[in-house]
């Protein structure tokens, strides 16, 4: 019998908790948090919605509309965090700087943050923002897992080639501390692999079914 990933049930019951404009508005710093980051229009909201089987994260044709830290509760001790998207040209510079300042404060001070999921559009991977996040994760000893989103936009062969290319680049620059996979929200590609990472970071273990 196939084992059911223990994080699946928690993700399916995810509920919106609150939005925070700055760190002191965040929930109590305890338990387990996994944050989702990505350049604007990298498919972050769609990935979050697919992982939770709900429309929790706001999606929009205008990238960068998520301007706050959005917290979603899985249970009393575990949360997912949707971080602000970055890099959209139409967002005013002062607002970009505001986002950056509070994102850095959150990432640098949050004791309950156990890992960072970084979204990269498979057609445009390793942007300047992505490199900054990689540098921060390694310097902070923060576990990072990359989703190469929108993998359905390429043929399977092209997607695999891009995955191998990015894997090689990351190993050369950042070592083996960062894991990476293909992901597609519309095709539901890569869900089980992503769930396994979440379960590990949130200290949930697969359990054999009762006989």
From Swiss-Prot:
The keyword Cell division applies. Mg(2+) binds at residues 45, 66. GO terms for molecular function: GTP binding; metal ion binding. It comes from the Bacteria. It holds the Pfam family MMR_HSR1. The keyword rRNA processing does not apply. CDD domains: YihA_EngB. Its cofactor is Mg(2+). This is Probable GTP-binding protein EngB. The lineage of its organism: Bacteria, Pseudomonadati, Pseudomonadota, Gammaproteobacteria, Pseudomonadales. One of its GO terms (biological process) is division septum assembly. Keywords: Cell cycle, Cell division, GTP-binding, Magnesium, Metal-binding, Nucleotide-binding, Septation. It comes from Pseudomonas savastanoi pv. phaseolicola (strain 1448A / Race 6) (Pseudomonas syringae pv. phaseolicola (strain 1448A / Race 6)). Belongs to the TRAFAC class TrmE-Era-EngA-EngB-Septin-like GTPase superfamily. EngB GTPase family. GO terms for cellular component: cytosol. GTP binds at residues 38-45, 64-68, 82-85, 149-152, 182-185. Necessary for normal cell division and for the maintenance of normal septation. InterPro entries: G_ENGB_dom, GTP-bd, GTP-bd_ribosome_bio_YsxC, P-loop_NTPase. Residues 30-204 form the EngB-type G domain.
């Amino acid at each position: 019998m196939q084992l059911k990933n223990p994080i699946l049930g928690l993700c399916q019951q995810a509920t919106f908790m609150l939005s925070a404009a700055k760190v002191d508005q965040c929930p109590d710093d305890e338990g387990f948090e996994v944050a989702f980051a990505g350049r604007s229009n990298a498919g972050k909201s769609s990935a979050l919605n697919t992982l939770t089987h709900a429309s929790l994260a706001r999606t929009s044709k205008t990238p960068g509309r998520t301007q706050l830290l959005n917290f979603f509760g899985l249970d009393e001790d575990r949360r997912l965090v949707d971080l602000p998207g970055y890099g959209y040209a139409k967002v005013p510079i002062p607002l970009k700087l505001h986002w950056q300042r509070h994102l850095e404060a959150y990432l640098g001070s949050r004791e309950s943050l156990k890992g960072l999921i970084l979204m990269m559009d498979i057609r445009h991977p390793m942007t300047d923002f992505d490199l900054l996040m990689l540098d921060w994760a390694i310097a902070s000893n923060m576990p990072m897992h990359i989703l190469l989103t929108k993998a359905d936009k390429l043929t399977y062969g092209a997607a695999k080639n891009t995955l191998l290319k990015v894997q090689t680049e990351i190993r050369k620059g950042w070592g083996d501390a960062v894991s990476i996979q293909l992901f597609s929200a519309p095709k539901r590609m890569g869900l089980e692999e992503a769930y396994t990472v979440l379960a590990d970071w949130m200290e949930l273990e697969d359990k054999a079914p009762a006989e």
